Amino acid sequence: MADCAGPSSAGRKAGAPRRSRKAAGTKQTSTLKQEDASKRKAELEAAVRKKIEFERKALHIVEQLLEENITEEFLMECGKFITPAHYSDVVDERSIVKLCGYPLCQKKLGIVPKQKYKISTKTNKVYDITERKSFCSNFCYQASKFFEAQIPKTPVWVREEERHPDFQLLKEQQSGHSGEEVQLCSKAIKTSDIDNPSHFEKQYESSSSSTHSDSSSDNEQDFVSSILPGNRPNSTSIRPQLHQKSIMKKKAGHKANSKHKDKEQTVIDVTEQLGDCKLDSQEKDATCELPLQKVNTQSSSNSTLPERLKASENSESEYSRSEITLVGISKKSAEHFKRKFAKSNQVSRSVSSSVQVCPEVGKRNLLKILKETLIEWKTEETLRFLYGQNYASVCLKPEASLVKEELDEDDIISDPDSHFPAWRESQNSLDESLPFRGSGTAIKPLPSYENLKKETEKLNLRIREFYRGRYVLDEETTKSQDSEEHDSTFPLIDSSSQNQIRKRIVLEKLSKVLPGLLVPLQITLGDIYTQLKNLVRTFRLTNRNIIHKPAEWTLIAMVLLSLLTPILGIQKHSQEGMVFTRFLDTLLEELHLKNEDLESLTIVFRTSCLPE
């Protein structure tokens, strides 16, 4: 027992120093961890204080750059301790206080434009002037952007270990831009873009939906080879390829179905005849037309090889005209450029169709509209104003040859025994020639004899009852009631009259055109305005015959001016009249008209009738 107790007590004595050493190591480790944590905390606090200090210094520099007297050395020194965001704040703050955004400029901002874009007629470009509004000139804007591009973008508190950049300022001799250029459209496709389509796609074209949907074509090469300008090779060079394809298709046809033997033999014959075609002469159409017709008549809609041959022939003729050799294109790139060229072809076709307008048709329509307008305007008072107060027209109407109308039953019915004055006949003749004459003047149908007989009997009965004292008249009471119900209304004044408004519109349109026509006559608009106003007062104006285009108003002014020249005392063979005639001839040539066209419009107001 004693022997057993001895070793156990010795083991307990040996374990006590081991536990004490372990406790001492744990205490020492915790002390080191606390020291590291406090050290890291101190370093973090120092870094935060350093960051705050640099930010405070940068903000102080921003405040200093808001002053007016800034030197170049101070500006380049400040660029080492600020970021582009700080410099942008400087530009904004200076523009708010109406100073130029460039710190070296001491000028004040004038009137700031409100628009966002500016069109430069010098460079034919559109610029975004949002940032340009903060500067007094294009040079200050360019110099400011030049300096801002040199400012480092790294944080200001980590620049101690970096090398400071050498700032440079823009010289005053160099010109600036009006703002940031706006790209209105993509650039045209060049040969270099075709050779390197990936670069072209990144710059000018967004990814299409077909590219994202087709995952199998992602690894496909866009172009097997390039498109090179030059002469096309003869069709004999592609004949072996077509012949080889036809043989391959022939073998596949024998394996699949024996019904295509005749068709394949026809394709081989066509391929051999295609080799004799020459692209640089007109024999191609005559040589290749019959084989193609033979293929089209014998091949069905399911056969693909003849269709490919026809498509290849069409592509050959197109490329022969453009003198471009197509070595090879993948399906993806072919679809891409097919969409591109289709859009350009649509634009060119729309422009060409809009340009191809027959001038003769437009000329006839213009003269027709003006004749109808002048005929509607003309009244009996117009002819009296032009040819005198004692003017009276007789049966002859010169405008009857100009306006051809079909007579209806209302126009045929007339009273040959009527003895109206001459001016009443001319008034009726003018009214009949108007195209907008309504059906209100038509003769009403005669009432039936039975109705007239009944009305006569009723009238006789009323008369008998009235004389017997049994009939009471209700007319006076009804009239008094009507007068009480309806309030009295005043007639329209001249300013509110529709006719006066139309005359004012016509005079306003003519006043814009006549000053240019009066230059050869050496008179002003005020000299003829009274006569023109009196002439317009005699017109019959509606809401439709006063709406015309500027070219039509020019011709109307020429017609009216030629009518007023005798009244103004200007003779046709005088010097002013001859100059005016030559001027009208030149103006008519610019409008693609002749002197006869103007005469056909003027003759509407002239007649072969004699004065009374």
From Swiss-Prot:
Q: Where is the composition biased (Basic residues)?
A: 15-24, 246-258
Instruction: Quote the record's binding site residues for Zn(2+).
Output: C100, C105, C136, C140
The GO terms this record gives for MF are: protein serine/threonine phosphatase activity; RNA polymerase core enzyme binding; RNA polymerase II CTD heptapeptide repeat phosphatase activity; zinc ion binding
Q: Which portions of the chain have biased composition (kind: Polar residues)? A: 294-305
> Which controlled-vocabulary keywords does the entry list?
Acetylation, Coiled coil, Cytoplasm, Hydrolase, Metal-binding, Nucleus, Phosphoprotein, Protein phosphatase, Transcription, Transcription regulation, Zinc, Zinc-finger
**Which catalytic reaction applies to this protein?**
O-phospho-L-seryl-[protein] + H2O = L-seryl-[protein] + phosphate; O-phospho-L-threonyl-[protein] + H2O = L-threonyl-[protein] + phosphate
According to its UniProt entry, the protein's GO biological process terms are: PERK-mediated unfolded protein response; snRNA transcription
Name the major location.
cytoplasm
Disulfide cysteine pairs (residue numbers): none
* Nucleus as UniProt keyword: yes
For the modification Phosphoserine, the affected residues are S9, S216, S433, S480
EC number in record: 3.1.3.16
Q: Name one GO cellular component term.
A: nucleus
Q: Which Pfam families match?
A: RPAP2_Rtr1
Q: Where is the composition biased (Low complexity)?
A: 206-218
Q: Which residues form a coiled coil?
A: 33-68
Q: Which residues carry this modification: N-acetylalanine?
A: A2
Instruction: Tell me which residue ranges form RTR1-type zinc fingers.
Output: 77-160
Disordered as annotated region, ranges: 1-40, 193-267, 292-317
Q: Per the record, where are the segments of Basic and acidic residues compositional bias?
A: 193-204, 307-317
Q: What subcellular locations does the record give?
A: Cytoplasm; Nucleus
The UniProt entry's sequence similarity note says: Belongs to the RPAP2 family.
Name the job this protein performs.
Protein phosphatase that displays CTD phosphatase activity and regulates transcription of snRNA genes. Recognizes and binds phosphorylated 'Ser-7' of the C-terminal heptapeptide repeat domain (CTD) of the largest RNA polymerase II subunit POLR2A, and mediates dephosphorylation of 'Ser-5' of the CTD, thereby promoting transcription of snRNA genes. Downstream of EIF2AK3/PERK, dephosphorylates ERN1, a sensor for the endoplasmic reticulum unfolded protein response (UPR), to abort failed ER-stress adaptation and trigger apoptosis.
Subunit annotation: Associates with the RNA polymerase II complex. Interacts with transcribing RNA polymerase II phosphorylated on 'Ser-7' on CTD.
What protein is this chain from? Putative RNA polymerase II subunit B1 CTD phosphatase RPAP2
